Amino acid sequence: MPRAVNGTIHKNRRRRILKDAKGFRGARSKLYRTAKSAVMKAGQWAYRDRRAKKRDFRKLWIIRINAAARENGLSYSVFMNSLKKLGIHMDRKSLAELAFNDREVFNSLVEKIKVAG
């Protein structure tokens, strides 16, 4: 009986790694061993950056809200605290969207805060 060498399984594994390495530069997309390590490292970076992306967007939203609030004479912390006290429950993403794209609505929120406080 001939020796079984897992031909199709082996070939499919190599094909999948080389497919995932498509677009990498040089040997990283051609040679299995270097492609395998490049794909593993790319996976680590992707895992890390999926988490960093959430932090980065939150930072961006806070910067945008702060800039728009300061144009109206409030700091970010005073603005957010006043919203909380007034019972206006809006997340930072939607506040940043208002500050960036719909300044009139954002300014009306600021006026509401100034009237109340």
From Swiss-Prot:
SUPFAM superfamilies: Ribosomal protein L20
Keyword terms, alphabetized: Ribonucleoprotein, Ribosomal protein, RNA-binding, rRNA-binding
Keyword rRNA-binding annotated: yes
Top-level taxon: Bacteria
Entry-linked CDD domains: Ribosomal_L20 (cd07026)
Record keyword RNA-binding present: yes
Pfam name, any one: Ribosomal_L20
GO (cellular component) term, any one: ribosome
UniProt-listed InterPro entries: Ribosomal_bL20 (IPR005813), RIBOSOMAL_L20_CS (IPR049946), Ribosomal_protein_bL20_C (IPR035566)
Any one GO BP annotation for this protein: ribosomal large subunit assembly
Alphabetized GO MF terms: rRNA binding; structural constituent of ribosome
Protein purpose: Binds directly to 23S ribosomal RNA and is necessary for the in vitro assembly process of the 50S ribosomal subunit. It is not involved in the protein synthesizing functions of that subunit.
Similarity annotation: Belongs to the bacterial ribosomal protein bL20 family.
Name this polypeptide is given: Large ribosomal subunit protein bL20
